[in-house]
């Protein structure tokens, strides 16, 4: 993964700009997997998306050969720069104009595409915030 992505309406973008050591994480991988598993849990339990799997080398959550959630992080002094994005109900045609994440022939999908249901980004965000119980409300803010 890496290189280039697209952010737009109908997509949830999560930038957890915190020093992960202050929250008990012992490694970058543990921090990234915690967030990925929280997102996976909400997409499965709340949205009904099935067969989600995390791929380290492709930096995201996948359903077979289709990418639904992305991570792009660089860490500076144990604080992540950038974060995660999740396709909820966004227009996927924008991805056809780029090579998403530097992966040729990458198929991009969304919650809407996978389930046929339209979820509000705010509702999914609220569920993800609830899934991340170790953080207090002052750390995670929504726009």
Predicted regions and their residues:
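Catalytic beta-strand/loop module used to bind and position nucleotide/cofactor moieties
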Residues: 1, 6-9, 16-143
């Amino acid at each position: 993964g890496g290189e280039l992505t697209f952010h737009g309406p109908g997509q949830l973008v999560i930038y957890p700009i915190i020093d992960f050591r202050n929250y008990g994480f012992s490694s970058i991988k543990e921090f990234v997997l915690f967030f990925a598993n929280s997102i996976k849990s909400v997409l499965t339990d709340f949205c009904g998306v099935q067969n989600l799997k995390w791929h380290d080398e492709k930096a995201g959550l996948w359903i077979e050969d289709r990418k639904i959630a992305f991570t792009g992080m660089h860490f500076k002094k144990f604080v992540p720069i950038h974060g995660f994005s999740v396709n909820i109900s966004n227009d996927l045609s924008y991805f056809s104009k780029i090579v998403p994440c530097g992966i040729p022939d990458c198929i991009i999908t969304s919650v809407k595409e996978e389930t046929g249901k339209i979820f509000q980004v705010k509702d999914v965000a609220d569920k993800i915030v609830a899934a991340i119980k170790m953080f207090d409300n002052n750390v995670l803010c929504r726009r």
